[in-house]
Amino acid sequence: MSESTASPAPAPWLAPALKTLLNQRGHAWLLSGPSGLGQYTLALELARAWLCLQPSEEGACGHCASCRSIDLRTHADLRLLMPETQMLDKAWPLHEKAQKEIDEKDRKPSREIRVDAARDMVAFTQTTRSGGRHKVVMIYPAERMNHITANTILKTLEEPPGDTRFLLVSEAAHLLLPTLRSRCQTHTLSWPDAAPALQWLVSQGVAPTDAQVLLDAAGGRPEDAWAMAQSGLKASTWLALPKAVARGEALALQAWTPAQVVAVLQKICHDCQMLAVGAAPRFFPAPALPVGAPLAALTQWSKDLLSSARTAEHPFNAGLMLEALVSQARGALRAKH
């Protein structure tokens, strides 16, 4: 399914974290935690507050020239390092050279943080700020830097020129170089309770009849559940998937990209494995799942899906890959003891 380029309103469980971080010292912070908890949103609100001309204890004022320029993606003292695909999805402007290369079809937008962007960021920190209190560099997701890119920013991260502050935002902090982690203070986001997460989803326009199912589908990650709703996914569609896949109906998954299909099948496989050993499923209610597949077949299917995940971002033929994945799933789910 297509992904929305919009962003949800900051969730209420981020407010205490924002207030805590605003009262802390330090020029480099690592905001970590699983995806879908709001790391990107929290980091942007923290950057907004640091740059705000009239901040309060709760954060940015939201209406000064600095806040407005962040809304317009034009703040001269804020630099984002992100994969170009995510920069475009979130409506952040690319460097002029990178935009030209993409427009002229010289290359596709990068899914990693490019070393050229890191070098531009280092140069950005060495220029005079435009008139505010700080310069801010936000890196998201920080684990999308390879070793060369990470080493490019290392010295600047350790000894930033002037009053530059860094926000490294990660959904897989264990993948970061230890030398990066050691130069940052860390704040780890905690999981919100289900009740406020559901209330927030409904406040963001998710149908009450869909909210619980989509929150479960997202593994309890509220922003991921919101993104599912934004893509058009309904509870009824999600609940019908496992048995449709067991029947070999590739049509049920044709709206997803190959990478998304693999992720959905991994969730079905996980929950079927849980049922097979007498445990509770996580992503689907038990009645929605096919039963009877032997654990050995499910375990082999899980291994096959891990292998498929390595090529799902760049399949040779998306249609053929979908057919193969569904055929593989049908075979595992209909296997006999």
Task: Identify what each model region corresponds to.
Residues M1-A49, P55-E58, A65-S66, G162-R165, ...:
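Charged, glycine-rich active-site and insertion segments that engage polyanionic ligands
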Residues S2-I148:
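Clamp-loader machinery-focused feature within the broader ASCE/P-loop NTPase space
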Residues A123, K155, S182:
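Conserved adenine-binding aromatic site and its adjacent loop/helix in ATP-hydrolyzing domains
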Residues Q126, N151-R165:
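Conserved catalytic/switch belt of AAA+ P-loop NTPases
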Residues G131-V136, P161-L167:
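Loop/turn-to-beta-strand initiation segments
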Residues R144-M145, E159, L175:
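Residues immediately C-terminal
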Residues H147-A150, R334:
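Short N-terminal helix/helix-N-cap motif within the alpha/beta-hydrolase-1
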